[in-house]
């Protein structure tokens, strides 16, 4: 029985961030393609449209863990719901996106929580 696009999208929606990253890497390897080109082109197109209106969605990007790495890992786990291993990998792999498409208030709150834990954070 073949899976429909909706079935696949629902399965992906239930995955953790790390599982989605692993899926993308496996797809790149299997089909001998790179998702990097598509990702690089998308922000350029989006930036042109955003110039006319105020930005409503933000990405919270962890740029560094700072001195208190354990506290940063705890904050990442709290914000994302990731397991200890996945949160540690995200912190160790900085810069990494902690939240995507967050509202301005949600992004500011996440940034504050991460900075209080000792991380350096950017909103994009």
From Swiss-Prot:
List GO BP terms, alphabetically.
translation
In residue numbers, the region (Disordered) covers 93-124
Keywords annotated in UniProt: Ribonucleoprotein, Ribosomal protein
Name the Gene Ontology molecular function terms of this record: mRNA binding; structural constituent of ribosome
> Ribosomal protein: is it a keyword of this entry?
yes
SUPFAM superfamilies hit by this protein? ClpS-like, Ribosomal protein L7/12, oligomerisation (N-terminal) domain
Q: Does the keyword Ribosomal protein apply?
A: yes
Q: Which InterPro entries would you find in this protein's record?
A: Ribosomal_bL12 (IPR000206), Ribosomal_bL12_C (IPR013823), Ribosomal_bL12_C/ClpS-like (IPR014719), Ribosomal_bL12_oligo (IPR008932), Ribosomal_bL12_oligo_N_sf (IPR036235)
Stretches of Basic and acidic residues bias are at: 101-116
Q: Name one GO cellular component term.
A: cytosolic large ribosomal subunit
The entry describes its oligomerization and partners as: Homodimer. Part of the ribosomal stalk of the 50S ribosomal subunit. Forms a multimeric L10(L12)X complex, where L10 forms an elongated spine to which 2 to 4 L12 dimers bind in a sequential fashion. Binds GTP-bound translation factors.
Q: What does this protein do?
A: Forms part of the ribosomal stalk which helps the ribosome interact with GTP-bound translation factors. Is thus essential for accurate translation.
The family line of this record is:
Belongs to the bacterial ribosomal protein bL12 family.
Name of the protein described by the UniProt record: Large ribosomal subunit protein bL12
**Species annotation:** Marinobacter nauticus (strain ATCC 700491 / DSM 11845 / VT8)
Q: Which gene encodes it?
A: rplL
